[in-house]
């Protein structure tokens, strides 16, 4: 269905009856160019502001916006919605993945801290055990040295006692011999061995 404006209706008969500008003029016809037709056409209103064309302009405006609305509703809006849904889904997946990775990282950190604490506790226990073992070994070594020294001291005391006893025995014999020699020098004769021994023994008791 076509809508014909009054301006188009006025120009249509002239275009239908007019001759081709490039055709040869008829016999006896003199062709002259004037600016009357162009002047009359130029004196008309600007087409968008021509009140006689408002109806057709409004109709085409409604048609254009209807087509644009249908295009937006059927083609552009669904595509934009699909893109937004896709981006939303992708963003949700990325957030879930980030949360999962963060949870794994937190778990790894907790595991590392637990292992580190266990290693420290084990190291402290090993150090304490080593110190205790060193103390025990030192105590055992000290006791062994003391026992060895005690045995050596006892052996030395026994030896000293033997030496004393032997020395005293030798001193008694020497004293008896000396006393016998002195008596012999004094009286010019020998004294009985029993008397000399008794005299030396009495002297030891008095000493």
Curated annotation (Swiss-Prot):
GO terms for molecular function: proton-transporting ATP synthase activity, rotational mechanism. It holds the Pfam family ATP-synt_B. Keywords: ATP synthesis, Cell inner membrane, Cell membrane, CF(0), Hydrogen ion transport, Ion transport, Membrane, Transmembrane, Transmembrane helix, Transport. GO terms for cellular component: plasma membrane; proton-transporting ATP synthase complex. The chain crosses the membrane at residues 53-72. The keyword Cell inner membrane applies. It is a single-pass membrane protein. Its main location: membrane. It is found in: Cell inner membrane. The keyword Lyase does not apply. F-type ATPases have 2 components, F(1) - the catalytic core - and F(0) - the membrane proton channel. F(1) has five subunits: alpha(3), beta(3), gamma(1), delta(1), epsilon(1). F(0) has three main subunits: a(1), b(2) and c(10-14). The alpha and beta chains form an alternating ring which encloses part of the gamma chain. F(1) is attached to F(0) by a central stalk formed by the gamma and epsilon chains, while a peripheral stalk is formed by the delta and b chains. F(1)F(0) ATP synthase produces ATP from ADP in the presence of a proton or sodium gradient. F-type ATPases consist of two structural domains, F(1) containing the extramembraneous catalytic core and F(0) containing the membrane proton channel, linked together by a central stalk and a peripheral stalk. During catalysis, ATP synthesis in the catalytic domain of F(1) is coupled via a rotary mechanism of the central stalk subunits to proton translocation. Component of the F(0) channel, it forms part of the peripheral stalk, linking F(1) to F(0). The b'-subunit is a diverged and duplicated form of b found in plants and photosynthetic bacteria. Belongs to the ATPase B chain family. This is ATP synthase subunit b 2.
């Amino acid at each position: 269905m076509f809508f014909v404006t009054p301006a188009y209706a006025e120009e249509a008969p002239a275009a239908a009856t007019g001759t081709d500008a490039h055709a040869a003029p008829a016999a006896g016809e003199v062709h002259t160019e004037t600016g009357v037709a162009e002047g009359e056409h130029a004196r008309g209103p600007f087409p968008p502001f021509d009140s006689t064309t408002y109806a057709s302009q409004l109709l085409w405006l409604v048609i254009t916006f209807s087509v644009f609305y249908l295009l937006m509703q059927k083609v552009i809006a669904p595509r934009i919605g699909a893109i937004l849904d896709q981006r939303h889904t992708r963003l949700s997946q990325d957030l879930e993945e980030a949360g999962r990775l963060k949870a794994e990282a937190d778990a790894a950190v907790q595991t590392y801290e637990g292992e580190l604490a266990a290693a420290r506790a084990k190291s402290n226990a090993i150090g304490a055990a080593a110190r205790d073992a060193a103390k025990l070994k030192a105590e055992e070594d000290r006791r062994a040295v003391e026992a060895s020294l005690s045995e050596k001291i006892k052996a030395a005391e026994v030896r000293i006692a033997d030496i004393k006893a032997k020395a005293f025995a030798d001193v008694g014999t020497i004293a008896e011999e000396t006393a016998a020699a002195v008596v012999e020098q004094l009286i010019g004769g020998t004294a009985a061995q029993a008397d000399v021994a008794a005299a030396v023994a009495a002297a030891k008791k008095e000493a």
